[in-house]
Amino acid sequence: MPKNTPSSSDPSPQHYFSESPQAPSRRKEFAISGHVGELTLSTDAGVFSQYGLDKGTSVFLEVMAKHECAPIVPGSFLCDIGCGSGAIALTLATRYPDCTVYAVDTNERARSICKENAVRNNLGNIIVASPEEVDPSIRFASMWSNPPIRIGKSALHELLETWLARLANDGVAHLVVNKNLGADSLADWMSNLSYPTSRIASRNGFRVLEVTVDR
């Protein structure tokens, strides 16, 4: 089970989706249960969930630990969009050690910390990148994400349209979204965009959504 989950939303005065955070560094450590044991991660000011594991990601990891996903072929590409310090990406990497996981974030401090966390936990199958650094021809078998809802509706829709289009024809995305921040309307929007979306769990105010491809 994830540990050190904060009881409130991250109150950072600077947006976690800023490309170059200027907030003074305030490192924190937290632990999560990976697929093969405990993982220890660092986070920092100016990065999403600067005090430890946030509620949404905690719910997501608990749900996905028990969810029966379709088999993924070794050598496939997987990704975490908006990786932050890397809790989701590192979990993916431990669950699918024969696949390559792209941990993607616009925030350079988040990318730096995610790289450190991957090295610290001896995970060599993670590539940390900005969105522009990911080859657009890559097709992903799986995407896991706690998407950056607070970037605004239009920007969020643009982000999801871009990345869902990079799913393989049999690919599946799993997202966690706060139900009070539009989870149900977002699910409807994705379904209408030819990405059939279903709710696989609802817990502690969050929805976990499964998104498939209809091409």
What is each stretch, according to the model?
Residues 1-36, 46:
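N-terminal auxiliary segments of SAM/dcSAM-dependent transferases
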Residues 12-26, 182-215:
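Class I S-adenosyl-L-methionine
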Residues 44-52:
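Class I SAM-dependent methyltransferase Rossmann-like catalytic core
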Residues 55-136, 142-145:
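Conserved SAM/SAH cofactor-binding pocket of Class I
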Residues 105-109, 155, 178:
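Short beta->alpha hinge that forms the Motif I/post-I loop of the SAM-binding pocket
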Residues 141-154:
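A short SAM/SAH-binding and catalytic strip from SAM-dependent methyltransferases
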Residues 157-169:
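A short glycine-rich, Lys/Arg-flanked "PGG" loop and its adjoining helix->strand segment in the class I
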Residues 170-177:
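Conserved beta-strand signature within the Rossmann-like core of class I S-adenosyl-L-methionine
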